[in-house]
């Protein structure tokens, strides 16, 4: 793997000193960026077609480079690996799964696949990003956690309007849920290791529904999948666990991830005292970046740095940029992060 010129993020990941806290944002390439919206409009295709097109995905992934972020995350969807498994979602605008998971037979019908054969576009995106960047910035890969994917597969669409139904299914159909999560765990390990082999300098696992998962379900189903995944990943690339607004820091610390990406419910100062060697990512409120004034954003960033002491810290949001976020607020976030993130 080539030498990275802007190595701040990689240095933090390897517990090395930096001149300032690195910054990037979840969903940094997307609907808050007018250039993305224009590109998507000009392209005219559905999202799944764009995700499968390495040339366009590379172009979109690189858009945030112009605002000064310290890492590029590939433009892709957490549902991508479900297509070769026989559970592909249609984006119309979607996502829609024709047959939501309801039976053990459906779980057993999921197809094992080789990412090198069936997800060549993902490898092409990661390799293409490294070729375009020429070592300028590190490239991040990612995957949805088994439970995040299970939420979509059980709901058959975006689960946000069906949370209670999905949780009821998990509690009532424990054997189906267990089998589904076991299959998804093995698939996710292969998928993330494939990304690492394709050039990802670090990978992030998205536990996207951690904020609505009851503690007992988290302990029974979520925690074991995280531990299995992180223990099976290639050690050449650090790993990040994102748990959306989960207060269960004790469980997160047992996951085996190199970095914990935490929400507003976690104060970084006591979190660092609890685990001094852990690297934390986050955790500026995305609603402040979306709806606040520039001064509000500045103060939120300063507060975050005061909590972390600018040590073992990657500045990010509590979760992804909201669609309504003004692009000038995104630019201000990065500018102020670089200004106040200096390590003295």
Regions found by a protein language model. Name each.
Residues 19-27, 72-74, 139-143, 203-205, ...:
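Hydrophobic faces of well-ordered beta-strands that scaffold small-molecule active sites
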Residues 157-203, 215, 223, 227-235, ...:
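Alpha/beta enzyme core
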Residues 1-87, 91, 227-228, 327-344:
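N-terminal basic, low-complexity leaders that serve as flexible interaction/assembly modules and, when applicable
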């Amino acid at each position: 793997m080539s030498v990275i010129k802007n190595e701040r993020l990689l240095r933090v990941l390897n517990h090395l000193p930096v001149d300032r806290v690195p910054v990037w944002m979840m969903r940094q390439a997307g609907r808050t960026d007018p250039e993305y919206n224009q590109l998507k409009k000009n392209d005219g295709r559905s999202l799944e077609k764009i995700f499968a097109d390495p040339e366009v995905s590379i172009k979109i992934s690189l858009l945030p480079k112009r605002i000064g972020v310290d890492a590029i995350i590939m433009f892709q969807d957490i549902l991508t690996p479900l297509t070769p498994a026989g559970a592909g979602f249609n984006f119309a605008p979607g996502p829609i799964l024709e047959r939501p998971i309801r039976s053990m037979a459906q779980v057993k019908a999921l197809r094992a696949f080789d990412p090198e054969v069936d997800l060549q576009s993902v490898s092409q995106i990661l390799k293409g990003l490294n070729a375009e960047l020429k070592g300028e910035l590190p490239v991040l890969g990612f995957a949805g956690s088994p439970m995040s994917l299970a939420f979509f597969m059980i709901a058959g669409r975006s689960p946000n309007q069906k949370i209670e139904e999905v949780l009821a299914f998990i509690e009532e159909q424990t054997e189906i849920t267990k089998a589904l999560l076991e299959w998804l765990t093995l698939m996710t390990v292969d998928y993330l290791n494939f990304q690492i082999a394709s050039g990802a300098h670090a990978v992030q696992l998205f536990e996207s529904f951690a904020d609505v998962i009851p503690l007992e379900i988290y302990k029974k189903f979520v925690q074991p999948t995280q531990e299995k995944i992180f223990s099976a990943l290639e050690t050449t690339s650090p790993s990040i666990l994102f748990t959306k607004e989960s207060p269960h820091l004790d469980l997160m610390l047992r996951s085996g991830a190199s970095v914990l990406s935490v929400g507003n419910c976690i104060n970084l100062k006591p979190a660092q005292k609890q685990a001094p060697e852990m690297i934390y990512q986050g955790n500026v409120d995305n609603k402040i970046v979306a709806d606040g004034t520039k001064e509000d954003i500045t103060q939120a960033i300063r507060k975050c740095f005061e909590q972390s002491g600018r040590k073992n810290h990657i500045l990010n949001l509590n979760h992804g940029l909201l669609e309504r976020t003004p692009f000038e607020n995104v630019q201000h976030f990065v500018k102020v992060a670089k200004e106040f993130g200096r390590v003295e």
